[in-house]
């Protein structure tokens, strides 16, 4: 068995101390990130059982979030116009979710902020999708054009749905084709 002084000399060596400090810092950083990004196991959070149940029923089971932008195809907007209208819808949806549900916004951002653009054949379809999304409690943003360039003033151009649970949004827009 090594002598007590040899063990103490080994423990006092600078590289051993550096290793111990590095491991401790890594553990603290990992714990801080888990707390900051809400990645603690459910049993360690302060939510009650009923809060967790209602959240699961609202958010769905997949744990994935996305935003869908539905573009009216009958207006025959140019690519730049579509990009501008989709941007308006995305910013509007972001502002709403930031105010109403910052925790869901954080989850959507953690998922990489996925956005998908799909097309709807006409205004009636857009309005029906709006009603369905509202019924499911999803965030919606309907954009009306000012009419300064390509299309008539007040035309409803793009519907933003989400950010929200992907499986819930798919119930509204899953049948639509990509733009």
Curated annotation (Swiss-Prot):
Pfam families: PTH2. Keywords: Apoptosis, Disease variant, Hydrolase, Isopeptide bond, Membrane, Mitochondrion, Mitochondrion outer membrane, Transmembrane, Transmembrane helix, Ubl conjugation. GO terms for biological process: apoptotic process; negative regulation of anoikis; negative regulation of gene expression; positive regulation of anoikis. There is a cross-link at residues 47, 76, 81, 95, 106, 115, 171, 177 (Glycyl lysine isopeptide (Lys-Gly) (interchain with G-Cter in ubiquitin)). It is a single-pass membrane protein. Its EC number is 3.1.1.29. It catalyses: an N-acyl-L-alpha-aminoacyl-tRNA + H2O = an N-acyl-L-amino acid + a tRNA + H(+). The keyword Transmembrane helix applies. One of its GO terms (cellular component) is mitochondrial outer membrane. GO terms for molecular function: peptidyl-tRNA hydrolase activity. It is found in: Mitochondrion outer membrane. The keyword Transmembrane applies. The chain crosses the membrane at residues 15-37. Its main location: mitochondrion. Ubiquitinated by PRKN during mitophagy, leading to its degradation and enhancement of mitophagy. Deubiquitinated by USP30. Monomer. Peptidyl-tRNA hydrolase which releases tRNAs from the ribosome during protein synthesis. Promotes caspase-independent apoptosis by regulating the function of two transcriptional regulators, AES and TLE1. It is linked to Neurologic, endocrine, and pancreatic disease, multisystem, infantile-onset 1: A progressive multisystem disease characterized by a variety of neurologic, endocrine, and, in some patients, pancreatic features. Variable clinical symptoms include global developmental delay, hypotonia, hearing loss, ataxia, hyporeflexia, facial dysmorphism, hypothyroidism, and pancreatic insufficiency. Belongs to the PTH2 family. This is Peptidyl-tRNA hydrolase 2, mitochondrial. It comes from Homo sapiens. The lineage of its organism: Eukaryota, Metazoa, Chordata, Craniata, Vertebrata.
